[in-house]
Amino acid sequence: MASTLFRNIQTHPLLLYPTSFFRRKSSVFYCTVNSTSPTATQEKQQCPRIKVSPQTQSKSLDKLTKDYETIIGIETHVQLSTLTKAFCSCPYNYGAQPNSTICPVCMGLPGALPVLNSKVIEFAVKLGLALNCKLSLNSKFDRKQYFYPDLPKGYQISQFDIPIATSGYVDLDLPVEFGGGHRRFGITRVHMEEDAGKLLHSGGGISGAIVDLNRAGVPLLEIVSEPDMRNGIEAAEYAAELQRVVRYLGVSNGNMQEGSLRCDVNVSIRPIGQSEFGTKVEIKNLNSFSSINRAIDFEISRQVLLHSQGQSDSIVQETRLWEEGAQKTVTMRKKEGLSDYRYFPEPDLPEVVLTEEYVDSIQSSLPELPETKRRRYENMGLSMQDVLFLANDTSVAEFFDATIAQGAQVKLAANWIMGDIAAYMKNEKVSINEIKLTPKELAELIASIKGGIISGKIGKEILFELIAKGGTVKGLIKEKDLVQIVDPAEIEKMVDKVLSENPKQLEQYRAGKTKLQGFFAGQVMKASKGKANPGLLNKILQEKLNAKS
């Protein structure tokens, strides 16, 4: 009965404030008086602005950065694609009306107890195994305490000292345009936690600012990397590989624009040869892989300039925001320490206990992962450029695998998918799952061209019709009478006719203007409606053109 009453109660604006407002007075004072956010005046006093002309910066920066080593680590939050939230039965739909999918548990109301979604455990184990981590068979949840309007309970359910997975790594291949090569980056830990709500500001029908708790309680996996990256390109490629992994596993859609994959980057620099780490700065608001790269490059430049001007003390442990429009980072707040969060075990949830049998069952269900797929494609003889393109998207990789399973030659299948099919998808803004062409028909098309049944030109025309409308290769060839002409006598008649109709061009060719061979070939192809076998046509044409008159 109590549950029914809770689910049907009308939401009151006051209930959207953090429950810490209703706690004891001392607790409120702790959260408000001891604020770590500096005022604008304090920030100006602590971090004097450096004025460097663009000309001076561009000339000296490359030289200066060579004297420093950059240390980069990334904390990645992956929003899980579960049907319901982590600790209640509410669904989560991106873009839903504010506060339309909430309940007493999401809102942190007194007496509302969390119940763990088993899918969160399953997805955490999957990701831990995929990232080559050591799993904790016994782990627990903890309360991470901090004050913010979008955190209704006044704490976040997370994992502190015993995360579900530790000590892993991820392998990736850098694109050729970035120097290529294989990289391995360490994974410190993977832990489960719940998401917070979101502050919505003026715009889109909203006046002022409101707290939207739809996202509160949505399950997350936080992946903490080792500080193994040394530049923006490596960091961006690491994040892209994590996106590929979670999409291959099906644990998340990994869409950065929806907040399903959020990366917080920690950057510090130190003089070459120094073993002690420099002061790290956290960067947030990174909504794309390119913004990760650019934000890191800017932050490296900023810190190097401060060091070079004797103002390294101005580099403080803080959180900075990446401003896409201004292409720079700006101070958001001073960084909290672990002690500020006052972690302690979550009393309302039991320990998470995994059995070896459970882990083994998940291990056996894992799909082929991006790294394994890249090595398999490489062993097929494909170039690294081809490998990276095909393995980047799980749907494209599945389409390619299905095509070669139908007997298509590996390189030809890759060329068609990476060329005309990819161009069509880009122009029409569709995925490979949305086109009408099937792997079976692509394999049939490749075989028809290779077997001389149709020409490559006709093949392209058929391809675009198959992509847009579907159908079969054999059906279209028969319907449109597209079978290639391979009878030498028939092609010879067409060549003779074209030469007799163009005596002036024939005379010019025999006078030394040999580029006109292409003109004659084009005329014959036009007469045959593109059906003349190109190899046979060129052979007969050359014999006729070079024959003595």
Curated annotation (Swiss-Prot):
Record's subunit section: Subunit of the heterotrimeric GatCAB amidotransferase (AdT) complex, composed of A, B and C subunits.
Transmembrane segments annotated in the record for this chain: none
InterPro entries tied to this protein: Asn/Gln-tRNA_amidoTrfase_suB/E, Asn/Gln-tRNA_Trfase_suB/E_cat, Asn/Gln_amidotransferase, Asn/Gln_tRNA_amidoTrase-B-like, GatB, GatB_C_1, GatB_Yqey_C_2, Gln-tRNA_amidoTrfase_suB_CS
Single GO molecular function: glutaminyl-tRNA synthase (glutamine-hydrolyzing) activity
Entry coiled-coil feature ranges: none
Chain's role: Allows the formation of correctly charged Gln-tRNA(Gln) through the transamidation of misacylated Glu-tRNA(Gln) in chloroplasts and mitochondria. The reaction takes place in the presence of glutamine and ATP through an activated gamma-phospho-Glu-tRNA(Gln).
Pfam assignment, any one: GatB_Yqey
NCBIfam families xrefs: gatB (TIGR00133), PRK05477.1-2 (NF004012), PRK05477.1-4 (NF004014)
Family: Belongs to the GatB/GatE family. GatB subfamily.
Note: This protein may be expected to contain an N-terminal transit peptide but none has been predicted.
Signal peptide: none
Subcellular location field: Mitochondrion; Plastid, Chloroplast
Catalytic function, reaction form: L-glutamyl-tRNA(Gln) + L-glutamine + ATP + H2O = L-glutaminyl-tRNA(Gln) + L-glutamate + ADP + phosphate + H(+)
Predominant cellular place of this UniProt entry's protein: mitochondrion
Name assigned to this protein: Glutamyl-tRNA(Gln) amidotransferase subunit B, chloroplastic/mitochondrial
EC nos: 6.3.5.-
PROSITE patterns: GATB
Record-level GO BP terms: glutaminyl-tRNAGln biosynthesis via transamidation; mitochondrial translation
Keywords: ATP-binding, Chloroplast, Ligase, Mitochondrion, Nucleotide-binding, Plastid, Protein biosynthesis
Cellular-component GO terms for this entry: chloroplast; glutamyl-tRNA(Gln) amidotransferase complex; mitochondrion
Keyword Protein biosynthesis: yes
